[in-house]
Amino acid sequence: MAEIPRIVLPHGGYRKLTVYDKSETIYQATVLFCRRFLPAHGDRTVDQMTQAARSCKQNIAEGSAASGTSKETEIKLTNVARATLDELEEDYLDRLKAEGLAPWPMADRRAMAAKRYGREHADWAYWKPIFESRPKDVFCNLMITLINQTKKLLDGMIARQEEDFKKFGGVRERMHAARTAARGESWDKGIYSCLDGATTLADLNARADEIRRKISSAVYSIKRRK
């Protein structure tokens, strides 16, 4: 007997994801950057940067929560999280330009060391003492490295979500599949119950004839509706 498909898929668990840990670190570091290097009042960049950083982690969380009923919503929210990191990266690049500096080249030993550290550590607890002590230019470059690592993780997540959508479809499709399977299961149970009640071969044949008549009647009704 076929298993009835689930309507609400497993969801949540975003706090166990490395990409969420990195997004939390990016948010906390951005708040610290604004506190250390930007004026407390009168600079709209402070709100823009903190909101972009917060939006990333919030959309990851909301997408994870929505994935049980809507894979489409999950994909959209994860894409929003990815887009906000592009915006935030531009803010850090602008800060470097304002200081007359450029981002570290990919082959720069500092960039390579930052990438290694970022691959090994995602939690804010590991990054906090580093960001509290580094000058503005190093801070910006470290953030650019972290942001790019997180964007790559989000790209992989979006690709997996797209495959899940192809496999499981939307909630309406799953509801239809579940209803269809449930009707089939109910029909199967009715047939088996009817046949199991037979006590003789003649009785079994009579019950089978009755089932065939019901099937023919159902087919006729369907054709008339068409």
Predicted regions, residues:
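Amphipathic alpha-helical assembly/interaction segments
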Residues: M1-K226
